[in-house]
From Swiss-Prot:
Function field: Bacteriocin with a broad antibacterial spectrum against various Gram positive, Gram negative food borne and multidrug resistant pathogens, and against some fungal pathogenic strains. Displays bacteriocidal activity against L.monocytogenes ATCC 7644 (MIC=80 ug/ml), and inhibits the growth of M.luteus KIBGE-IB20 (MIC=160 ug/ml), P.aeruginosa ATCC 27,853 (MIC=80 ug/ml), S.aureus KIBGE-IB23 (MIC=160 ug/ml), B.cereus ATCC 11,778 (MIC=80 ug/ml), E.coli ATCC 8739 (MIC=80 ug/ml), E.faecalis ATCC 29,212 (MIC=40 ug/ml), A.terreus KIBGE-IB-35 (MIC=40 ug/ml) and A.flavus KIBGE-IB34 (MIC=20 ug/ml).
Domain of life per record: Bacteria
Temperature dependence: Optimum temperature is 35 degrees Celsius. Highly thermostable. Retains 60% of its antibacterial activity after heating to 100 degrees Celsius for 3 hrs. Stable during storage at -10 degrees Celsius and loses no activity during storage for 6 months.
UniProt keyword list: Antibiotic, Antimicrobial, Fungicide
Gene Ontology BP terms: defense response to fungus; defense response to Gram-negative bacterium; defense response to Gram-positive bacterium; killing of cells of another organism
Organism: Lactiplantibacillus plantarum (Lactobacillus plantarum)
Protein name from the UniProt record: Bacteriocin IB45
pH sensitivity of activity: Optimum pH is 6.5. Retains 70% of its antibacterial activity at pH 8.0 and pH 5.5.
Length: 10
């Protein structure tokens, strides 16, 4: 999927 931020790791 799209690249995830380390803080929103869902």
């Amino acid at each position: 999927x799209a690249p995830q931020n380390x803080m929103n790791g869902l």
